[in-house]
């Protein structure tokens, strides 16, 4: 797998911090560390073993930890993240395309 998921995780955290700041939602640093850990675990798996998208992981975590159903979209977290998610999707599609040959 060529895709660098660590960059994607970093952009998710950066975008979420900005989103929370803009919307005056306060969390401690442990919140971000735990989310980063969950994202790293899921996204380090081979594509065929990943059961959730990064956005699903993010929103599920927020719902469970903050008891808020915010349904944050990648667009709300910045264009860099949007681009990285597109690349992640392309890499995932390539993975499955290669497996079908």
Regions found by a protein language model. Name each.
Residues 65-101:
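Amphipathic alpha-helical binding modules
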Residues 33-44:
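Amphipathic alpha-helical segments that form the core helices of the histone-fold
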Residues 20-29, 47-52, 70-72:
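Charged, low-complexity interaction regions
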Residues 4, 8, 30-35, 50-54, ...:
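Residue-level detector of well-ordered alpha-helical segments, enriched
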Residues 1-32:
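Short terminal alpha-helical segments
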Residues 43-53, 89-91:
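Short amphipathic alpha-helical segments at helix boundaries and their inter-helical linkers
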């Amino acid at each position: 797998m060529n895709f660098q998921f660590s960059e994607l995780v970093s952009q998710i955290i950066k975008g979420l911090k900005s989103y929370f700041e803009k919307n005056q939602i306060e969390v401690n640093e442990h919140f971000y560390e735990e989310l980063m850990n969950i994202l790293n675990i899921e996204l380090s798996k081979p594509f065929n073993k990943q059961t959730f998208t990064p956005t699903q992981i993010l929103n599920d975590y927020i719902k469970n930890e903050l008891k808020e159903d915010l349904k944050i979209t990648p667009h709300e977290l910045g264009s860099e993240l949007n681009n990285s998610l597109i690349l992640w999707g392309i890499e995932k599609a390539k993975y499955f395309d290669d497996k079908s040959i």
